[in-house]
Amino acid sequence: MQDQTTTRWYHYVSYFFGGAFLANTIPHLVSGISGSPFQSPFASPPGEGLSSSLVNVLWGMFNLVVGYVLVARVGRFELRQTRHAVVFGLGILLMAVMLARVFGKFHGGNL
């Protein structure tokens, strides 16, 4: 029988992508809650056009649920375990940098 506390390689992959999904939650949820249109995969053209605030709230919540599942329901994520936290943080960082570059060209952030 396998030890329940063993972290497998795919747990780290899950924590990385969980961090990425959770980072992607923020711009969509904040824009949606504030009533502002924002880019989404459902806009025309995808990722460039603007989607309604409702679409962004729903997309942000979808990202939140997927991020939760990947972090909290796969393996035994422990924020106090350095490797778990680093992999999770790298997922957040990579997605945040990508989002800054992509959305910066639409909102004046790429100086």
Write out the residue ranges for each language-model feature:
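Membrane-interface extramembranous regions
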Residues: 2-111
